[in-house]
Amino acid sequence: ALDTTAAQGITRLDGHPFKWERHTEFFTLTLVVPCTAADTDWQALPPVLAEAIAPQAAQVINAVQVLVRDEQGLDLPQYGFKDPCGSCVGGGDAVVWSDFRLTEDGTNRFLFINRRLNAYRQGRMIRRLLEIETYRMMASLTLTTAKALSQELDAFDKTLVTLSERSAGGEGHDSKGLLEAIAHLSRQVVSRTVKTRHRFGATQAYAQLVFERLGELRESHVGDCQRLGVFIERRFKPTVRYCAATEQRLEQLAKNVANLGDLLQARVQVEMEEQNAGILRSLNARADAQVKIQRAVEGLSIIAITYYLLNLFKLLYGGLNVLGLGLTARDGLLAMAPPVLL
């Protein structure tokens, strides 16, 4: 019985070794079927395995068939390749052929010609070929995401240009609305960053594995044919570079949005400081006016008090004159006026 919780396992299917491996993002199945050296036909999947895979056909990332043959009596055209690529691998101990044309069921075919490899080295070399194709397909999954994101980035760039022009126009009365628009754009950019970061990171990791496995093949030319590694790199590197460029574009956009927000925040802060300074100046002017008014009121109060005192003394001296003291009110007021005024 299969242990479904294990990371990998080996069993037998129709009497043939059947290996399965669980990876982080995908699941691999490897079936080894012996065949005679004279057989030039590509083997079909056993019915049991084909029926098991059929319901999951839409989720199949990559299907590769490797046919192993000896170099003696090789007739390459019999294997149905059209303009194949070929490479000597393992320091010339084996030759690999493929035209990278998918069959009707989506299978990519490799013809592996073993010259001087033992079983262990042959297995390692075939495994590298399988990993190259698997990792290449896994890395290419991000291309659809990158294309969709690129269209969104075009719209975000236009929005950022519009907001930058509004900010440069000095529309101080609309600073709040401008800040809200920048915050909304920032949220959208951050959302796209969070959603795509894992996928872009996976693409870089898978691409690095592809190039490492290609280097481990130690390829050399077979006649005038294009090497497998050259064929793969010419078609795979643009995908990797496009994804990397899209990721960098997203990161740069996030920085530009953040910088615009910081600049606007600084401008709003300066405007608020200027408003506060104006309010303080207004308060100081009002305080000065109140001090002047208070001084004027105090001066008027002194005049009024002096006037009342003089009238009071006038009545007093008038009464004393009536009593016969010989001091008229006028003389008394003249004598008292200086100290009263002081």
What kind of feature is each model-predicted range?
Residues 288-342:
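Alpha-helical transmembrane anchor segments
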Residues 1-15:
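General N-terminal leader/first-domain-start detector
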Residues 21, 32-183, 187:
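Extended alpha-helical interaction modules
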Residues 24-26:
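Elongated alpha-helical scaffolds
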Residues 184-310:
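Membrane-associated alpha-helical segments
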Residues 64-67, 209, 238, 245, ...:
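Cytosol-facing regions at membranes
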Residues 162, 166-169, 195, 209, ...:
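Conserved helix-loop functional segments at active or binding sites
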